[in-house]
Design a protein with these regions (language model features):
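Short, intrinsically disordered, charge-balanced linker/junction segments flanking boundaries
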Residues: 136-140
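N-terminal low-complexity or simple alpha-helical regulatory segments
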Residues: 1-113, 126-135
Length: 140
């Protein structure tokens, strides 16, 4: 029987949402570029997860871990910028993704720890930001 892994369905929904954000009433809307990049990244991550768990493709695990960590940082950059503007140290948010790439080259067993720690850290930071309510996102 034909089946589609659930992450692929999630990716389709994200791509449809991205298309709806981009093409409104017959014209291309280029606003909210960081959010559109974020949605595209999550669609890519959903496809990578679907390939891993739906079809057993393990070759893309390094890319999956790197994209996951990069999207956590990018999520913070998108929503943090709405709260207090784009910071000067924004480039430092690329360090966890760089650490994952370097760990895959030198010590692959440490990747899971870095991924879990990074996702937990950015998740807690986003929860802390969300706890302040919608008024905290003054630049939205």
């Amino acid at each position: 029987m034909f089946s589609i892994p659930f992450p692929f369905l999630g990716a389709i929904v994200l791509v449809l949402l991205l298309a709806q954000m981009t093409w409104r009433q017959g014209s291309v809307v280029l606003a909210n570029r960081p959010l559109r990049i974020l949605l595209g990244g999550y669609a890519l991550l959903s496809v990578l997860v679907g390939l891993r768990w739906g079809h057993g493709v393990t070759l893309l695990l390094p890319l999956q871990a790197t994209v996951a960590v990069a999207l956590a940082a990018w999520s913070w950059c998108c929503f943090g910028a709405l709260a207090h503007g784009a910071g000067r140290w924004r480039v430092l948010h690329a360090l966890p993704a760089l650490a994952v790439v370097l760990l895959y080259a030198g010590w692959p067993d440490g990747v899971e720890t870095v991924v879990a720690g990074t996702l937990a850290g950015y998740g807690l930071a986003l929860l802390r930001l969300a706890r302040r309510g919608p008024d905290a996102l003054g630049l939205a």
